[in-house]
Amino acid sequence: MSKSLQKPTILNVETVARSRLFTVESVDLEFSNGVRRVYERMRPTNREAVMIVPIVDDHLILIREYAVGTESYELGFSKGLIDPGESVYEAANRELKEEVGFGANDLTFLKKLSMAPSYFSSKMNIVVAQDLYPESLEGDEPEPLPQVRWPLAHMMDLLEDPDFNEARNVSALFLVREWLKGQGRV
């Protein structure tokens, strides 16, 4: 953060709506110039998530998973919450086993992303998984997740697939491409 910027003062935080999964807060702010505003946000949970980009035999492994927000099956990388006490790498390996049926001997952290930071505090850790071995764990998915193997040589063609459009997946694709370029693999 720029040292010349002063964060606004939080004057009040109030819960304005609650459901089984979400809590919406109203946040009264005063900026350093004296201007006051009321914003709304999802209550911070202080839990992060992980997105895993598995690579095997020069292919990416993606899954198709139902997204109720878009009411469609989305093509993307495996992801899930980091459980309390888990490291990013432990969560990545667990989610990979639950959703893809593989574990990884080689996990590489690429970047931590935020999504809609004006409304959410959540962070997504992007991890590449390599040197895979078959291993499954029971997950919390309501149905099996079909896998799609996509050749690394054509990875950017994913951008043309109408089911591959979620922003974190697109970001992960670009991050992985740059990481692979740095290794001389694409």
Curated annotation (Swiss-Prot):
This is ADP compounds hydrolase NudE. InterPro entries: NUDIX_hydrolase-like_dom_sf, NUDIX_hydrolase_CS, NUDIX_hydrolase_dom. Keywords: Hydrolase, Magnesium, Metal-binding. GO terms for cellular component: cytosol. A motif (Nudix box) lies at residues 80-101. The gene is nudE. One of its GO terms (biological process) is nucleoside phosphate metabolic process. The keyword Hydrolase applies. The lineage of its organism: Bacteria, Pseudomonadati, Pseudomonadota, Gammaproteobacteria, Enterobacterales. Pfam families: NUDIX. Active on adenosine(5')triphospho(5')adenosine (Ap3A), ADP-ribose, NADH, adenosine(5')diphospho(5')adenosine (Ap2A). Its EC number is 3.6.1.-.
